[in-house]
Amino acid sequence: MGKLEKIEKCVQKGKEDELVKLVHDRDKNVRLAAIAGVGRAGKDNACNVLITLLLDDDPEIRSASASALGDLGDPRAHTLLMHHLGVEKDERVAASIKDAVGKLHGGG
């Protein structure tokens, strides 16, 4: 089974720990899929993991992390997303952060 298939299985079974390991994979496609998976199936540690990824050098990873935080729906993310919105220079990432904040307020 490939890593992308493994991610989907982990999402279905709610295996947050396995997904968290994969957000740091060398393959960017695996990372992006795992980040989305954490947003869909994350529980206890998901918010913290996704917030740290907002500091990643890659804007695509930051954008995916913001989107996943919106999908996760954890209200703890709101303040940190707003902070990152104030310092984010990439317009696509900023748009993802705005969308995530909207989801957290029930608009998504």
Show which residues each predicted segment covers.
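Conserved hydrophobic register position within alpha-solenoid helical repeats
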Residues: K3-K6, A34, S65, I97
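Acidic (E/D-rich), amphipathic helical modules within compact regulatory domains
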Residues: R26-A33, G37
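Short inter-helical turns and helix N-cap capping residues of alpha-solenoid HEAT/ARM repeat scaffolds
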Residues: R26-D27, D57-D58, K89-D90
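Eukaryotic acidic, Ser/Thr-rich intrinsically disordered low-complexity regions
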Residues: G86, V93-G108
